[in-house]
Amino acid sequence: MANSGITGPTLKGLEKGASLAEFRNHLWNWDMNDFTQTFALNTTAAFFTVVAFLELLDKGNKAGNVEQKSQVICISSAGAFNRVPMAGYAYAGSKAAAVHIMKALATTLVPYDIRSNVLAPGRKSRYRPRTVLSYLFADDCSVS
């Protein structure tokens, strides 16, 4: 499971009804490194976490000591699909990029029998990472 997330620069502090010039100035004053770091953690780090485990996942498949095939799960965010940048443009963009990468991996990893999935929980979702992990590691594997 690849899970990471920082928001990066946000619209916090921008007055509601700001002029276009004020809006542009607010965005222009963001630290570009903060914006880039958001992608480095939310997208790049999640991708390389998956890459780091590919051979181990393949060994698990070849061992065949469980019914299901190996899979990778990346935690994205509902913000990846939201047109309103509630957590900021870098956050939404980085989480959308993570979704797309996992979709591409879902196709690329087919010959190796490794599944690739992405979860995109929202703020009040029952599918938040902690909840999902509790289901994955429950003795009876039930979802309430």
Locate the predicted segments by residue.
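A glycine/serine/threonine-rich, flexible loop-to-helix segment
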Residues: 14-18, 120-144
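Hydrophobic structural elements of the Rossmann-like NAD(P)H-binding subdomain
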Residues: 1, 73, 116-119
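Short intrinsically disordered, low-complexity coil segments enriched in acidic
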Residues: 1-8, 144
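Short, highly charged low-complexity linear segments
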Residues: 110-115, 135-137
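Catalytic loop of short-chain dehydrogenase/reductase
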Residues: 5-39, 51, 55-111, 123-125
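Structured catalytic cores of enzymes that bind and process phosphorylated ligands/cofactors
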Residues: 46, 85-87, 137
